[in-house]
Swiss-Prot record:
Zinc finger (C2H2-type): 68-90, 96-120
Species of provenance: Cochliobolus carbonum (Maize leaf spot fungus)
Gene Ontology molecular function, alphabetical: RNA polymerase II cis-regulatory region sequence-specific DNA binding; zinc ion binding
Region listing for Disordered, in residue ranges: 1-67, 109-140, 152-190, 231-250, 262-331, 353-430
Protein name listed in UniProt: DNA-binding protein creA
Cellular localization per UniProt: Nucleus
Family to which the UniProt record says this protein belongs: Belongs to the creA/MIG C2H2-type zinc-finger protein family.
Gene (name only): CREA
């Protein structure tokens, strides 16, 4: 033992740094051992407390009354909203609908709707990205076809950002797995629309890394909608196709609703080629004003052989003839006679506003006026002549007013006078 201690002392003299480190380690060991023992003791004491804690909270919870019982099963609940939520599991009621455009899902609980809405609000979520993409595309196309919005305007809030490139071994024509696309695809509305929208999906997959990846899918969607408009399956006449390609001011995009507000139904009822194309027959029945099936400009060839003209009170249909225009307020209209007009006069009489008249209006009959007019009096150069004439009152005697015949125009005064006399007579008798 002495030799070992002497050797260690000699080593400490040669290496003083290692000697100081050994002393520090020896001092730390006794201090660390009590801290470890204290931690183990606290964990051993906390373990039974943690195990007993939920038991203490559950015992009074089970003792609470459950007044709300399910009428369909034996379960009872503490709160009414819990019972209502449970009954929906039996009835299948789903009152909470998703408000995202294009999404038709409904839920029986509000927390399920909140969890589902995170899929739409978070564009980076992997779950449901394909369904979100297809639903937004379907909603945008439906809005364009219904005429509610133009294809190139504000589609960013309707469409999610394009997905990342997907590596797959399937052919390029298949855009994804069958369960990603919605069950109600676009083929039930128009044949071949998926081919037009294929460019939009491919553009969204290929241009996602570029900064213009959001703008390009919008342009592709607008082009697909314009190609759908010019498809011969939706155009039931050759002249309509000619006008669409030549006269149409919007060659690369769909027109707005305001462009054809009064001419959205170009074909008359008696001359339509609905029997030539079954798709046009189906779409003309369900089309609305401004829809793609009826946005072509009106053509005179559609109604030239129409026997029954379109009524004037339907402004959305183009009639076979020009509407009959008559002055709107013809009672105040005073036109000079033709003989009083000359070519040297620069005065042009102002006409009343012209509007299409209905069939119930009577034809215009100018009223014969006698005497001077206010315009003639004001236009006289002399100031003394600019006076209104004294109104001419028919000279009738008082006896004629009281005892005149009933057809003289004073029957009402006669009746009132006789009534007043009778009243005075009765008052005198009393």
């Amino acid at each position: 033992m002495q030799s070992n201690s002497a050797s260690t002392g000699f080593a400490n003299l040669l290496n003083p740094e290692t000697a100081s480190q050994n002393q520090q380690q020896q001092q730390q060991q006794p201090t660390s051992t009590p801290t470890a023992s204290m931690a183990a003791a606290t964990v051993s004491l906390m373990a039974p407390l943690l195990q007993n804690a939920p038991q203490q909270t559950e015992e009074p919870r089970q003792d609470l009354p459950r007044p709300y019982k399910c009428p369909l099963c034996d379960k009872a609940f503490h709160r009414l909203e819990h019972q209502t939520r449970h009954i929906r599991t039996h009835t299948g009621e789903k009152p909470h609908a998703c408000t995202f455009p294009g999404c038709t899902k409904r839920f029986s609980r509000s927390d399920e709707l909140t969890r589902h809405s995170r899929i739409h609000n978070n564009p980076n979520s992997r779950r449901g990205k394909g369904q979100q993409h297809a639903a937004a595309t379907q909603a945008a196309v439906a809005a364009v076809q219904a005429g509610l919005m133009e294809p190139g305007s504000n589609l960013a809030h309707m469409m999610p950002p394009p997905s990342k490139p997907i590596s797959r071994s399937a052919p390029g024509s298949q855009l994804g797995s069958p369960n990603v696309s919605p069950p109600h695809s676009f083929s039930n509305y128009s044949p071949g629309m998926s081919n037009d929208l294929a460019a939009y999906h491919q553009g969204g997959l290929s241009n996602s890394s570029s900064p213009s990846g959001l703008a390009r899918p919008m342009d592709l969607l607008a082009d697909a909608a314009s190609r759908l408009e010019q498809r011969p399956g939706h155009i039931s006449h050759s002249s309509r196709h000619h006008l669409t390609s030549g006269y149409h001011p919007y060659a690369n995009r769909l027109p707005g609703l305001s462009q054809y507000a009064y001419s959205s139904q170009p074909m008359s009822r008696s001359h339509s080629h609905e029997d030539d194309d079954p798709y046009s027959h189906r779409m003309t029945k369900k089309s609305r004003p401004g829809s793609p099936s009826s946005t072509a400009p009106p053509s005179p060839t559609f109604s030239h052989d129409s026997c029954s003209p379109t009524p004037d009170h339907t402004p959305l249909a183009t009639p076979a003839h020009s509407p009959r225009l008559r002055p709107h307020g013809f009672s105040d209209l005073q036109l000079p006679h033709l003989r009083h007009l000359s070519l040297n006069q620069n005065f042009v009489p102002a006409l009343a506003p012209m509007e299409p008249s209905t069939e119930r209006e009577q034809p215009y009959v100018p009223s014969q006026s006698s005497g001077l007019r206010i315009g003639d009096i004001i236009s006289k150069p002399e100031g003394a002549q600019r006076k209104l004439p004294v109104p001419q009152v028919p000279k009738v005697a008082v006896q004629d007013l009281l005892n005149g015949p009933s057809n003289s125009g004073f029957s009402s005064g006669n009746n009132s006078a006789t009534a007043s006399l009778a009243g005075e007579d009765l008052s005198n008798r009393n």
